């Protein structure tokens, strides 16, 4: 759920959406797996960070609801997590957003719109995928952004996913 704090319209109230994100990647065809990047691995890579937005409250950093929400969470004993809170990603902090997965809260620098979501997604995934285009739709709102890819990513010849900074595949352990 989110809201447009300071907006004079329906969106000033807390409300939620179901969104669809399309990620287009580009690179050379990896000869070991005969594809640019395995589709299921794109989904897993994206979901690792994007699950922070699932069933989360997404508020702009100056929204006065934040302290009140945290106070209620504290009183309920869920501010620092709960055993049933299993669908959460790793905490992250970027220039555009900070995720607090234990309390299902994402604080953003800007009002969360489809355009804002695209900026955040790109910022979180640009070092993991060679993204050429992101499209995000939510309700009747939709936006796309295209990016220029420079160079190719070093990928595993066995499973096709990006190698880490040490040349090791995080999925299968292959070493370059």
Map each language-model feature to its residues:
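Charge-rich, low-complexity N-terminal segments
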Residues: 1-145
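Long, C-terminal-biased catalytic regions of enzyme "large/alpha" subunits
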Residues: 123, 127, 135, 143-176
């Amino acid at each position: 759920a989110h809201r447009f704090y300071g907006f004079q319209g329906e969106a000033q109230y807390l409300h939620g959406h179901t969104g669809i994100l399309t990620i287009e990647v580009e690179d050379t065809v990896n000869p070991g797996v005969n594809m640019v990047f395995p589709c299921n691995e794109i989904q897993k890579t994206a979901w690792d960070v994007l699950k922070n937005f699932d069933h989360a409250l997404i508020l702009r950093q100056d929204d006065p609801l934040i302290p009140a929400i945290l106070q209620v969470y504290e009183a309920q004993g869920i501010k620092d997590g709960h055993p049933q809170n299993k669908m959460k990603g790793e905490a992250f902090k970027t220039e555009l957003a900070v995720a607090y997965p234990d309390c299902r809260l994402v604080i953003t620098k800007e009002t969360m719109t489809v355009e804002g979501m695209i900026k955040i997604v790109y910022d979180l995934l640009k070092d993991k995928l060679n993204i050429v285009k992101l499209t995000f739709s939510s309700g009747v709102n939709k936006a796309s952004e295209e990016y220029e890819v420079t160079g190719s990513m070093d990928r595993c010849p066995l499973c096709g996913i990006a190698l880490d900074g040490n040349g090791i595949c995080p999925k299968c352990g292959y070493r370059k």
